[in-house]
Amino acid sequence: MDAWGKTTLFLDASDLGGTPSKHALDDISSKANAAGLSLVPSRKLSAPPIYASSVLRVAKHDGRGIALRISLNQIASAATWMGTWPIPFSETDLIIDLASSVATVVALGPTIFSPFQSLHQATAWRSVTLAGGNIPATLSGYTVGCTMLPRAELQLWTSLRAANLDYQLHFGDYATIGPDATTEGIEGPVPINAKYTIRPDYAVFHGVKTKGPGSKPRDQQYRAYANLIVKMPNRDPLAHCWGDQMIDAIARSATSAPGNPASWVSYGVNRHIELTRHQLP
């Protein structure tokens, strides 16, 4: 948060609990304000009533508005629900969240431009952001090794930016986390996986389990991923990227700690954010 500074931060806390008069979001907002953060609560149209009430309560108290996440289908029906939106559009950041469907949307070609070009009252919103992610929820079914997946969300955003929209379209994604990913119901041992972002693609490394037939030690698999990453001809390493520095250290020294699942998620997310910041205008 120290690095984030005063930059606006959207937060959807709808998965957390609360009552009609008190939601976890209220406490989060209070602590964020005390820390000097510019938190804007985010919600979907279908948000639970208790959470929707807390979002409105925080918005009225903090005076920073609301971020509204809608689906592609809800763009077409905007004229029917915008009349019930509780605060002015000028105080609302609209997020068109394609989630994991972004690759399917890209496959539609130029026909997908129409909903964005005809976005109802497009210039009335405080901001409009396209979000999505092409990382699968699970690598089950993927072959062992490295698979390159296109950054479909960046492809779509780039195409829409060139489609003569009459509003500025901002970019958002899920970094290297699958939009539908979950940690519930996962029983070990599990394959050792990792994800790394280059300019046009995600490099998705699918490994094997650490126990049982065909297994390999976790450390051995992570070190192999690091060695493959540093040898990528189009890697474009970033000098001040912590994630890149950690991966370089793992590849450079056979005695360095090769990391664990949580640390490799951190390396991948940090690298993704730093690279994307360099790519966006």
Predicted ranges, named:
Residues 2-8, 31-40, 60-66, 86-93, ...:
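Structural alpha-beta junctions
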Residues 1-85:
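Active-site beta->alpha loop and helix N-cap motifs at the rims of alpha/beta catalytic domains
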Residues 50, 102-104, 137-139:
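Short catalytic/ligand-binding loop motif for oxyanion handling, primarily in non-cytosolic enzymes
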Residues 67-72, 93-107:
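Surface-exposed cleft-lining segments at the edges of enzyme active sites
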Residues 108-120, 125-281:
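C-terminal accessory extensions appended to soluble enzyme cores
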